[in-house]
């Protein structure tokens, strides 16, 4: 059938060259949906849109308490362990602390959406402190991320993870389109992807001049936003200076073990979560002839991270609802998701594939986008893999 309907196309989901592993991809419909945003909103209980300052702070307190407990246990007991146990204990600490700090990151992200409380100044103060502590320029990313939400799924205006057409793929892509190349690409993306995006706009929208999240006069920002970009930079400088003083007092190796490696895990999770939310063989992208806000917002996928769904405050498995109503607090998002599923029908995309398998599959299957053949397919682009 045409690109407007829910379409089944052949795709290898597991393994390469294994015919038994072939399963069909059920594409999300790309035609204009038979429902409106207001109809979706009416299906959600009204209390889901209410923000509680006390409840939001309770999540901050809970996460920071866990951070403090893990820090205390690590710095008090790990070095006292025998050698082999010590080397085994540090990775456990890194994993636990990295996961909890990712939850802290998500709360700061929620502040940027004004989903933390009814008071914008409270949201901005909390978000600035939490994100700065994780070396994220709060206001800078808040504004670029807002543009992503305003233009999701648009090949011409989306802010990040914008897929390229085949004609614009770099020359070296074909040399990386193999298992060793994918492993190398994933390692670089997970370790360096987030800081490179902030500093050099890597994987971001290609502006006509150099773009950087730390530059108040860069093309990402308007004149009205520049003062707050300075504030973000001050927050980063304050956090960096604090880390410098800690390293001077305790040693760089101590700082890397206690803070640096968990932060690396936070950054890796951030890239993984964002990539898998917007990259899937079933999801369409649109050019200006077809794009509209609702279809773009629906071109996202919910994923299953197991117990980490709760640790990450359900940003992983309620992302569709988040894109539709970004000021909704996370503690109501599960209820809202259940309420909107019957309305969305085939327009709702959930994939329960284990995360490590999904990352590998998407790295293999989702290399570039092109429209399908046929007049009815113009303006709607789908992921392809044959370079």
From Swiss-Prot:
Which Pfam family, any one of them, does this sequence belong to?
A: DUF3474
Keywords, in A-Z order: Fatty acid biosynthesis, Fatty acid metabolism, Lipid biosynthesis, Lipid metabolism, Membrane, Oxidoreductase, Transmembrane, Transmembrane helix
Q: In which pathway does it act?
A: Lipid metabolism; polyunsaturated fatty acid biosynthesis
Q: Which residues cross the membrane?
A: 58-78, 88-108, 121-141, 183-203, 229-249, 251-271
Alphabetical GO CC annotations of the entry are: membrane
Q: Which domain of life is it from?
A: Eukaryota
Where does the record place it? Answer: Membrane
Q: How does it sit in the membrane?
A: Multi-pass membrane protein
Coiled-coil spans are: none
Q: Which cysteines are cross-linked by disulfides?
A: none
Q: What is known of its domains?
A: The histidine box domains may contain the active site and/or be involved in metal ion binding.
Stated family: Belongs to the fatty acid desaturase type 1 family.
What task does this protein carry out?
Delta(12)-fatty acid desaturase producing in a heterologous system linoleic acid (18:2(9Z,12Z)) and to a lower extent hexadecadienoic acid (16:2(9Z,12Z)).
Q: What is this protein called?
A: Delta(12)-acyl-lipid-desaturase
Organism encoding this protein: Punica granatum (Pomegranate)
| Gene giving rise to this polypeptide | FAD12
